């Protein structure tokens, strides 16, 4: 699974750069641009987190893989909801907080995998 997390982290990083360019040049409204920028920041940090999970997963076991899954689902939910609001004015209900919870769960699972690893 470690190669999958690295590949998904690289994809998320690539899309972060693309979204940053779109946000900087295609959103004329300041409020919408600030909202979208928060999604770009969260996406950037968690792209790096996925790369870290990919490097750690061979030693971190199942908990590390669960952390990677939580990061991916959290990115899709949180950033998707933020981008929908910024670009289309669509309120996605509980999707953003659910995504935020999944991102936090990913960090907790990653930390727990480090504490439980046998080294």
State where each predicted segment sits:
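Polytopic transmembrane helical bundles with strong interfacial aromatic enrichment
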Residues: 1-119
């Amino acid at each position: 699974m470690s190669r999958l997390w690295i590949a998904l982290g690289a994809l998320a990083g690539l899309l972060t750069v693309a979204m940053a360019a779109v946000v900087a040049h295609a959103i004329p409204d300041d409020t919408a641009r600030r909202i979208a920028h928060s999604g770009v920041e969260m996406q950037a940090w968690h792209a790096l987190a996925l790369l870290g999970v990919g490097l750690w997963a061979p030693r971190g076991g199942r908990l590390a893989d669960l952390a990677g899954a939580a990061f991916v689902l959290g990115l899709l939910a949180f950033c998707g909801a933020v981008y929908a609001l910024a670009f289309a004015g669509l309120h996605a209900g509980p999707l953003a907080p659910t995504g935020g919870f999944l991102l936090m769960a990913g960090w907790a699972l990653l930390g727990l995998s480090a504490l439980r690893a046998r080294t």
